[in-house]
Amino acid sequence: MTQSPFTLEANGLVLAVRLTPRASRTGLDGVRTEASGRPVLSLRVAAPPVEGAANAALTAFVAKSLGLRKAEVTLLSGETSRTKRLLLSGDPQTLAARVEAWLGG
């Protein structure tokens, strides 16, 4: 059974992301497993990792893809790292269903 790149919290859902900045296009690459064995959502953005541009592009892309407001997607950790944790605010079960649908499963 494949592990999920997200965990349910009382106030929403925490999504583990591996971000590739300065990509040719912004998009979702699917779920991958890091060397530590932790599953992460692999995403790419066209924005460079300069002055928070890639992080802003990431939160905007995730919000748009899941039908959320930008304010409902918060960067919890990984501001200067490729591995990040995002908090998606809202009903955890609804958010989990949206993420699963986005991942195609």
Swiss-Prot record:
A cellular component term from Gene Ontology for this protein is: cytoplasm
InterPro entries in the record: DUF167, YggU-like_sf
Gene3D superfamilies from the UniProt entry = YggU-like
Q: State the family it belongs to.
A: Belongs to the UPF0235 family.
Q: Which NCBIfam families match?
A: DUF167 family protein
Matching HAMAP family = UPF0235
Descriptive protein name: UPF0235 protein Mext_2130
Q: Which organism is it from?
A: Methylorubrum extorquens (strain PA1) (Methylobacterium extorquens)
